[in-house]
Amino acid sequence: MKNSADITVLGAGSYGTALAISLASNGHKTLLWGHDPAHMQTLAQDKCNQAFLPGIAFPECLHIEADLAKALAASNNVLVVVPSHVFGSVLAQAKPLLRQDARIVWATKGLEPETGRLLQDVARDVLGEQYPLAVLSGPTFAKELAMGLPTAISVAGTCPKFTAELVELLHSPKRLRVYANDDFIGLQLGGAVKNVIAIGAGMSDGIGFGANARTALITRGLVELTRLGEALGASTATFMGMAGLGDLVLTCTDNQSRNRRFGLALGKGCDVDTAQAEIGQVVEGYRNTKEVFTLAKRMGVEMPITEQIYQVLYQGKAPLDAAKELLSREKKSETPAQ
């Protein structure tokens, strides 16, 4: 079946819209679909996403499509950019409408709610083994990507041909550099764990601990990510790249990050509900914390920072008490004996 569009993007929030803008700015005919018909009508009329990316006009190659069936019929390349807690339900909605030659890539960062399973497992459960799968991950703020500021990300998947073609489709010499990676598991993990650590970095700064503490937390957070990744069969090299260290540093140090701002509010004394309300958009790290904590327990992996953040978010522990517990942990070597 011939494509009438180069790619269809499912998810018209800030990040989905930003990726659609980037693709269309590169000359690719891009369809953008979202679940709210009224929102999609507004996007079509305004030719920008005023709610999430105000003032950034849509390129001519970006088209709004409110009908999911038409959106999925237009292209075999489907980019899913929705919150992790609705990832499975969106795939289930799309499944009967997918083309036989469809290929699925997602930029969703997170794990399955409650179970902590990787999104690849959710996708396979919903879609079966028929479709090639891939994931995008890396240090990207939606606004900067949409504005065309230089950005770099990584892509990995189940099919090398699909991965290579995604690199070509997404890459733009002026705005977006895309690195191929063969670590499908590592890219998925990095995007979830960094959200958790960013909340911790925000809490540390909100308490007033300063740059030394923030840097220590980021560094030990990277250790936790690597430890979990190794247990799941990921490559440690991945966590030194865009989807690991890159995304972790970005999200932990810049206030464009909702997760960091959420942590800041908690560190300054807000309760969880008030802090979430202040952000006004989905704080992926809130759910990610429970997901990562669940996965770590199931795998028997020690993640003390993640555990303390979990206790703050879900058990009412004070951020300062969590910090004190981390600081009072038993002394240990940074380079354990092999």
Curated annotation (Swiss-Prot):
InterPro entries from the UniProt entry: 6-PGluconate_DH-like_C_sf, 6PGD_dom2, G3P_DH_NAD-dep, G3P_DH_NAD-dep_C, G3P_DH_NAD-dep_N, NAD(P)-bd_dom_sf
Places the protein is found: Cytoplasm
Pathways involved: Membrane lipid metabolism; glycerophospholipid metabolism
Residues that hold sn-glycerol 3-phosphate according to the record: 109, 138, 140, 194, 247, 257-259
Active-site residue numbers: 194
A biological-process GO annotation: glycerol-3-phosphate biosynthetic process
Residues the record lists as binding NADPH: 14-15, 35, 109, 142, 258, 282, 284
Record-level GO cellular component terms: cytosol
EC number: 1.1.1.94
GO molecular function, one term: NAD binding
Known catalytic reactions: sn-glycerol 3-phosphate + NAD(+) = dihydroxyacetone phosphate + NADH + H(+); sn-glycerol 3-phosphate + NADP(+) = dihydroxyacetone phosphate + NADPH + H(+)
Keywords of this entry: Cytoplasm, Lipid biosynthesis, Lipid metabolism, NAD, NADP, Nucleotide-binding, Oxidoreductase, Phospholipid biosynthesis, Phospholipid metabolism
Record's function text: Catalyzes the reduction of the glycolytic intermediate dihydroxyacetone phosphate (DHAP) to sn-glycerol 3-phosphate (G3P), the key precursor for phospholipid synthesis.
Family label: Belongs to the NAD-dependent glycerol-3-phosphate dehydrogenase family.
Protein name: Glycerol-3-phosphate dehydrogenase [NAD(P)+]
Species of origin: Shewanella sp. (strain ANA-3)
